[in-house]
A protein has these predicted regions:
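Bacterial N-terminal signal peptides
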Residues: 13-25
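Bilobed "Venus flytrap"/periplasmic-binding protein-like clamshell domains
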Residues: 37-59, 63, 96, 119-186, ...
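Ligand-binding clefts/hinges and TM-proximal coupling segments of bilobed small-molecule sensing domains
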Residues: 67, 146-162, 248-294
Length: 294
């Protein structure tokens, strides 16, 4: 399989900032004594993401006996390119970003994150609380909607797949915009800058708990079926013994340990393979973002 060329061009642009940052870090991703880690935009800002996830990566590096660098990306697409290009050795990434990377030659997923004890989450569509939407998507036709960046599973791929599988093109059906972060989507709906937006349940919960939005600021009008949670993925060419150690270390994290090294609600990992993300890959093919190479 290969990624549609138009999508590649857009995704590569999202990786440039990360590539520059990694270059500044010095060294090479293949250095035996240093591993380069990256994490996608799981918090409102890269700084917050890095702070929240550094304890996990620090512990991983210590148990592997290596030093490490850590970068937090500004979008989901950029981390996929970074892993594919070998700038990153181990990445905590969204399911769609992982599938993009895998289909461009990156290595496999070795673990799937558990959130509140479950290895699944859900895409959602949120709306202004004053909107009367009882039937989706019918009652949303013609309204303003903000999708996340094209590397996002819940913010772009899954809602696009769901709509297109019903014969609807979101770019025509709505007043469409894409490219926002999930946090920006929640804020935009809360502030009335858009009528509708995509998000995922974990992010909305985290923003409510942090006080970034109130529970009444937005309302959920659509929820997807279960989706596999974030992947811990390794680059192609990483020593298989190191990849196995990464898997063993992260899947050994207990619920108690998770409370000290992982952000709230994350409770550890299960061992994983690429097969666990097949439904994401199938959705990518269905919307034309991934094509069979025949």
């Amino acid at each position: 399989m290969y990624l549609d060329r138009g999508r590649v061009d857009r995704i590569v642009k999202g990786a440039l900032t990360l590539a520059f940052a990694l270059a500044l870090a010095g060294g090479t991703a293949k250095a035996a004594d240093t591993l380069h880690f990256a994490v996608g935009p799981l918090q409102p800002t890269p700084g917050e993401t890095k702070k929240a996830f550094d304890p996990f990566f620090k512990r991983l590096a210590e148990q592997l006996g290596v030093t490490y660098t850590l970068e937090a990306t500004t979008d989901w697409a950029g981390i996929a390119v970074a892993l594919t290009s070998g700038q990153v050795d181990v990445a905590w990434m969204g399911p769609w970003g992982y599938v993009i990377a895998h289909n461009q030659g990156a290595g496999d997923a070795v673990a799937t994150a558990k959130y509140d004890g479950k290895p699944v989450y859900h895409a959602i569509v949120i709306a202004r609380p004053d909107l009367q939407i009882s039937k989706w998507p019918d009652d949303g036709k013609g309204l303003r909607i903000s999708f996340a960046d094209v590397g996002s599973t819940s913010g772009w791929l899954i809602p696009t797949f769901w709509l297109k599988s019903r014969g609807l093109d979101p770019k025509i059906y709505f007043q469409y915009h894409e490219g926002a972060t999930h946090a920006a989507n929640e804020i935009a709906v809360a502030n009335g800058q858009t009528d509708l937006a995509t998000d995922y349940d974990r992010n909305r919960t985290a923003m409510i708990e942090s006080g970034a939005i109130s529970p009444q600021a937005t309302k959920i009008i659509w929820t997807s079926d279960d989706l596999p949670n974030d992947a811990i993925a390794v680059r192609a060419g990483l020593d298989p013994a190191v990849a196995k150690k990464v898997q063993d270390i992260v899947t050994a994290i207990t619920d108690e340990q998770a409370t000290t090294i992982l952000p709230k609600h994350y409770t550890g990992f299960i061992a994983s393979t690429h097969a666990n993300y097949k439904l994401i890959e199938d959705a990518g093919i269905a919307v034309g973002a991934l094509k069979n190479q025949k």
